[in-house]
Amino acid sequence: GLTMEGTAPGAAPRFVVTGEISCIYKRHGRTRKVHNLILLPSLEAAEELSVRLEAIGNIHSDGRPILGLDSRDLLELTLETCPEAEFIPAHIWTPHFAMFGAFSGFDTVEECFGDLADQIHGVETGLSSDPPMNWRVSALDRLSLLSHSDAHSPSRLGREADLLDTGLSYPELVQAIRTGEGLLGTLEFFP
């Protein structure tokens, strides 16, 4: 969450428009299953992206839509629709539904996202790992390590979080993810 410094007592909560999409697709003869997070600057941007995604599949059937769309292509479509969007591979070490998943993933960010790999600025580490584990993987050195809880698991909201020292705006949040400035670390649930 964002720091609350400078907010008035009783101020309304602030939200970041986000969604998680499950991409299930074939590439190089293997079935890939990768969950990705998308952060958007506004509800209007979310509506525009929703319209484009509805043309591909049913995004209303679940709290985490499943699309037969390559993760690289979802990233491209997202950035075409909203250049200010931030795209983050989710719980990257989960065995069955993650970028580095043992049963359905890839070995590198570049293998997953190809020519758009430089548009990935952070990864969500998930419950399957902790910061010291991730710090040992040199391929992650250029990326911000993030830790989130799932809105599709309401009873578990807040069990993991990012520790930020930024202003309370979407551009400042994204800047922290992209540069690491203002990203102090993560709050981790016990393993």
Sequence positions of predicted segments:
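Extended substrate/RNA-proximal surfaces in nucleic-acid metabolism proteins
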Residues: 2-121
